[in-house]
Regions:
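Left-handed beta-helix
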Residues: 49, 54-55, 60-61, 68-69, ...
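Short N-terminal micro-motifs specific to bacterial/archaeal maturation
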Residues: 2, 9, 27, 63, ...
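Alpha-helix boundary/capping detector
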Residues: 44, 66, 113, 117, ...
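Terminal amphipathic alpha-helical/low-complexity segments used for targeting or macromolecular assembly
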Residues: 1-50, 132-136, 140-141
Length: 141
């Protein structure tokens, strides 16, 4: 995938398209959840199966986002910037979480409400805060 620069016509079009889709998801979610889920999968082609989310969601570049299976996204998620973001399988994102470009959140992790994730979070970890930091491992099993 080539790097897109600010002012790039392709970047502007991708941004407009993503904003349009996310606005529609946020508008119809409670009246048409199946259609909202379909639009989410269009917005985020790298979305796994069994993802559960609550609006509003704010995702700038869904094509630069990978979300693993069985992930829960609480209300008011913000993923900003054009860097690739990876969210593992079975992750729980609390309400009002912000994720910055380039972050990887490991499988089976929990990100507390209001956290601002600026660095990678290991697998099987509870992490909270601004900036978000690991506070406790989650035992496997």
């Amino acid at each position: 995938m080539r790097k897109l620069a600010n002012g790039d016509q392709e970047l502007q079009e991708l941004t407009r398209e993503a904003h349009s889709i996310r606005a529609e998801i946020n508008r119809i979610y409670y009246d048409s959840p199946v259609e909202a889920q379909r639009l989410f999968e269009e917005l985020v082609p790298g979305a796994g199966v069994g993802i559960d989310f609550r609006p509003p969601i704010n995702i700038d570049y869904g094509m630069r986002l990978s979300i693993g299976d069985r992930t829960f996204i609480n209300a008011d998620l913000l993923i900003i910037g054009g860097g690739f973001v990876t969210i593992g399988d079975n992750v729980w994102l609390g309400g009002s979480v912000t994720i910055t470009p380039g972050v990887i959140i490991g499988d089976n992790s929990i990100i507390g409400a209001g956290s601002v994730v600026t660095k990678d979070i290991p697998t099987n970890t509870i992490a909270v805060g601004n900036p978000c930091r690991p506070i406790k491992p989650i035992p496997e099993g």
